[in-house]
Amino acid sequence: MTLNVVLLLGGRSTEHDASLHSYRRLRAALESAPGRITLHAVAYITREGGYRHFDTAPWPDTEDELRAGTDLPLHEALSRLTDGDAFVFSLLHGNEGEDGAWQGIAEVLALRGNFGPVLASALGMDKRLQAVVARDLVPGLRTPRTWMAPPSLARDPEALEQWAAEVAGLLDGRPAVVKPNRMGASLLTRVLPDPTGPALARATAAALPYDSQVLVQEYVPGTEYTCGVVRTGGRTTALPVVQAVTEHGFLGHREKHEHGLVQPLLHTTDTGTTRRVKQASVRLFDEMEVFGFARLDFLVHDDDLYFLEINTLPGLMHGSAFPRMLDAAGLDLVDLVEECAAEYGRRSVRDKALPYLIGHPAEETTAELEHSGV
């Protein structure tokens, strides 16, 4: 039976462009498999939060074409997504896409799609908290030393300078990485070889308008690895690990998105290191109850395995690591969509109706409450 799919893309997010690129590649893959999947509709959220809907081919390709679609109010857009038996495959990267926002909408509306649990996505967008969870779940797993700038610093430049000076003293001349806590794609992430107080303050101030939580981490030199994980046939499977080789030893936004700045080394045969990466990835994926698929990033330094972050909706664009890992495992993007739809059918559904017995009187007077000491 052919699977009907709605592609949901765009979003009011700093990763809007990544969503458009993932959409184009996935749409092309789905159109190449007409006997397996039917593209039922395209739902686009503009950068400003408007909703556009397309239910017939030819499907939009450019952002101008997407913006020219039927403009819908929110309630009607949600109604169309929940109407019928189509599976909604979300490509909403970043804020308001994979941070728990749309996952909550999907839970409340029983929206059939690859959204998954609220907590897994919310945790997946919070680098500081997921590091705490990861260390607890995987014995021996390390994370870089981290300091978080208090949100109030965005309104107090003097306090920001004082905080930055204190962190610079704790770093004691060691290089640092400054990054937003709740953004993806390494946006606004900077390496500071000489993290003086003023340098830390400037880098933190640049990120604060986009995220009220900014992290300063001690830079750990080493080799970066990324591991994809998918649910196939009801089982959690680690994909072949990719080692990221860069000229400057750091995998930032430019390295991830400009051709030739990173040399991905695909490990089709496991080593001791890649086995450790896979084991940690599967454990974290399962324990965090991530839905469908994810990508997890690690770093190895002096034989110590450092956890960097989990991405609960990795990019599917050309040049992204996740499709490369899928291909090495004998899978493609059409398989991924089909597996997500099958996994949705296998998910556990909580019973939310339970008798809640209350033995107190229906109404109590003020005098009775005062007498009882409440």
Question: Where do the protein language model's features map onto the residues?
Answer:
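ATP-binding N-terminal substructure of ATP-dependent carboxylate-amine bond-forming enzymes
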Residues: 1-119, 123-125, 129, 150-162, ...
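Active-site nucleotide/adenylate-binding loops and adjacent lid/helix of ATP-dependent enzymes
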Residues: 2-9, 78, 123-215, 221
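Structural element of the ATP-grasp superfamily
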Residues: 106, 130-134, 326
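Helix N-cap/coil-helix junction residues
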Residues: 111, 139-141, 290, 331
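Phosphate-binding site of ATP-dependent enzymes
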Residues: 193-279, 300, 304-306
